């Protein structure tokens, strides 16, 4: 239980981000600034797949207005603004005891959303700070964005941006490296262990155990694990 934990700080994050994020600098800024809450954000245009009219039954996204000290003074919910925005990554650092207090307050009032219901109405009272992230970030909001963000990793600069820093550990399954059978053709692909390529494949990502049979032609695809 959160109440019984001994750690002083809590990190909260959504699960729809592909990002190589080191929390050390963010935590240091949080402590030095004396913030109640620190929220990571990235300067970018709002992805088309995220834009939608305000609807409390949908996932919400937020943009910020910050002052010169990095304090968040205004929080906008599901805006359709054009151009580069301070777009929240929905990654937060907060003291555990303060979070427990906020959760209790939210529960007693039937509140649901951390940003909309707890932070936005209290920006003058709370010290809420922004932490700018400058690295590679992929936001997965639907099937199309999942496909698009996977395909972007076929470019070296994007692949290096995600995996070039700290290592990212994934599920381990010992298997043979991808086998390229004589007569097969492969161009600009990423393939995991256990794949067998007998046919032709181009501009595609192959998950573990995928087999491209002889005579098959695959292009611009993401093929999932067997």
Task: Pin down the residues of each PLM region.
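Left-handed beta-helix
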Residues: 97, 105-226
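Unchanged
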Residues: 1-150
């Amino acid at each position: 239980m959160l109440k019984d934990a001994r750690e002083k700080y809590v990190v909260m994050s959504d699960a729809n981000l592909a990002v190589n994020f080191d929390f050390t600098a963010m935590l240091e800024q949080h402590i030095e600034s004396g913030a109640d809450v620190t929220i990571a954000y990235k300067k970018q245009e709002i992805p088309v797949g995220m834009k939608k009219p305000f609807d409390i039954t949908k996932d919400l996204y937020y943009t910020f207005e910050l002052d010169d000290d990095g304090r968040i003074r205004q929080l906008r919910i599901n805006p359709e603004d054009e151009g580069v925005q301070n777009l929240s990554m929905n990654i937060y650092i907060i003291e555990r005891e303060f979070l427990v207090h906020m959760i209790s307050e939210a529960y007693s009032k039937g509140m649901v959303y951390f940003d909309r219901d707890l932070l936005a109405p209290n920006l003058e009272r709370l010290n809420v700070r922004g932490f700018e992230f400058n690295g590679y970030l992929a936001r997965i909001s639907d099937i199309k964005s999942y496909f698009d963000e996977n395909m972007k990793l076929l470019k070296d600069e994007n692949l290096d941006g995600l995996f070039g820093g700290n290592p990212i550990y994934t599920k381990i399954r010992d298997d043979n490296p991808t086998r390229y059978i004589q007569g097969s053709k492969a161009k600009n692909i990423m393939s995991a262990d256990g794949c067998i390529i007998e046919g032709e494949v181009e501009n595609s990502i192959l998950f573990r155990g995928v087999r491209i049979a002889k005579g098959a032609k695959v292009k611009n695809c993401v093929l999932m694990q067997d």
